[in-house]
Amino acid sequence: MKITNIQTKTLKAPLKNPFITSLRRVDALEDLVVIVECDDGTVGYGEGAPTPQITGETMGSMMATVAYIKPHLIGREIEDFDAIIKLIHSLIVKNTTAKSALEIALYDLKAKSKKLPLFRMLGGTQTKFSTDITISMSEIDKMIVDCHSAVALGYNTLKIKIGDNPQKDVERVIAIHGALDKNIKLRLDANQGWSAKQSVELLHALERQNIIAEFIEQPVAADDIEGLKYIKERVQTPLLADESIFSINDARRLLEMQAIDYVNIKLAKTAGITQALELADLSKSFGVKCMIGCMLEGPISVAAGVHVASAKADIISMLDLDAVSLLASHPMETSIDFNESKILLSDAHGLGIKYTLSTPTIN
């Protein structure tokens, strides 16, 4: 199988509700779809969401990155897979989401060439998963209503977005905790909104109310590594690093410092599947469990995340792959059953993707 062409398309889809964090507000999904074609007619599909506030990438920069890499891949054999992956990452630094979209498409092709679903090619066997759902930041009453709506849909784990106002954040969490049955698990995500000192004070305030979330995600700035360690040494609530980890070296530093309890893996940060798998292995060597998350992105890249979760099910113990459920509609059909909190993989080859010129669909 020889690569003959690489195309890019934009995917736009409305959200059910605005997605609001301490970093940004999003009203509609806009993703880049990457289509890699081979001489035997096999096609691979990848996807990535520009998230300039986190990865520094825009739609324009992602398209430019793919266009820059494209001529170096045309004519290459998929059988030279490892060399192709190494080449992609040697050609340009950073630009992690664009490279992830390319990687996903190439992994899709490789699995199709072996007539296997991607998760089985990667050594995975698990097919059934549960994800949380994100509750966007808003007024307390609205967030409580959104929590009840999510629970009614079958979610038993909610990720609460906070981080814009420290005192209000505590009030939000206390009110939400009090409004829900105690079997509902809460995850907190401040998206870098607090200082280290504030984090300790606010988490202590919650812990005095016997509110210990499943974790607090990235409470401080991405580069505040010492701040993460300061927090971990002073609170009961487990600490999960997100924006602080883009690379293996980022993770190794935090793990060696014993600065975190969990690692959040996102393909858009790890520049694709290859380093995501390596990151899971590294975390396992330190005895630290992982969560696999996603940006606000479409079914192709979310599906890739589920395949990775299956491949590393022994260390990826939590899923935050709710982006498909946040969409009001999208132009894709999927053999992967995204049924709110429940996700079920199929035995379709590769990611299981079928594409027409106008519509990317997952078959």
PLM regions: where:
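Flexible C-terminal active-site loop/helix
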Residues: T4-L15, L29, M295-N363
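N-terminal small/glycine-rich loop or linker at the start of catalytic domains
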Residues: K112-M137, E233
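Active-site mouth loops of central-metabolism enzymes
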Residues: K128-K142, I162-G163, A190-A196, L240
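Conserved, mostly hydrophobic/aromatic
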Residues: I3, V34, G41, I69, ...
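Catalytic core of soluble alpha/beta enzymes
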Residues: I160, Q167-S301, S329-P331, I336-F338
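Glycine-rich phosphate/pyrophosphate-binding beta-alpha loops
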Residues: G48-G56, T134-S138, M291-C294
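Metal- or metallocofactor-binding catalytic centers and their adjacent structured scaffolds
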Residues: N5, E37-S113
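Structured beta-strand/loop patches that form or line metal/cofactor-binding pockets in enzymes
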Residues: M1-D40, G44, A49-Q53, L326-S329
